[in-house]
């Protein structure tokens, strides 16, 4: 997860009339940092994108253009999951529980990956048109209905 500065998680359970259980998890987090890579092996160490072990260089002709690790920052993330359930007793300890779950209730797009490669081997100082574009997002809204047998 690297150096994610802020993370807030709240969970709760409410037992409604009729033994219906309603629970939720709310997660809000600041954006995760990521490394910006040059896209070329600038110092000949076999590791494309780094100028030294702790730096990436955007312009190979300039020492002043090196940037530190975790310079890029993803957008913040927010997610709400809910669950509604009720247990029905069949006999003795045996029962069945009906479940209805919604993940990512508000269908928010939470980006998890970004194109962090700035340039190419031929032109490491010229930004790629895809630099900084998001390449992957967390799962969209999902609904799940289930039955669980307990004994």
Q: Model features per residue range: what roles?
A:
Residues 1-151:
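Short, solvent-exposed micro-motifs at the edges of structured domains
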């Amino acid at each position: 997860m690297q150096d994610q500065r802020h993370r807030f998680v709240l969970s709760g359970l409410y037992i409604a009339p009729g033994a219906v259980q309603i629970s939720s998890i709310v997660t809000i987090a600041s954006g995760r940092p990521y490394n910006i890579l040059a896209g070329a092996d600038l110092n000949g160490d076999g590791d494309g994108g780094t100028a030294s072990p702790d730096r990436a260089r955007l312009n190979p002709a300039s020492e002043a253009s090196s940037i530190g690790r975790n310079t890029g920052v993803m957008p913040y993330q927010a997610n709400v999951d809910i669950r509604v359930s009720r247990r029905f007793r069949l006999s003795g300890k045996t029962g069945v529980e009906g479940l209805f779950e919604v993940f990512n209730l508000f269908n928010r797009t939470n980006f998890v990956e970004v194109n962090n490669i700035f340039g190419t081997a031929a032109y490491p100082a010229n930004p790629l048109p895809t630099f900084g574009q998001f390449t992957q997002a967390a799962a969209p809204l999902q609904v799940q209905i289930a039955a669980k047998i307990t004994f």
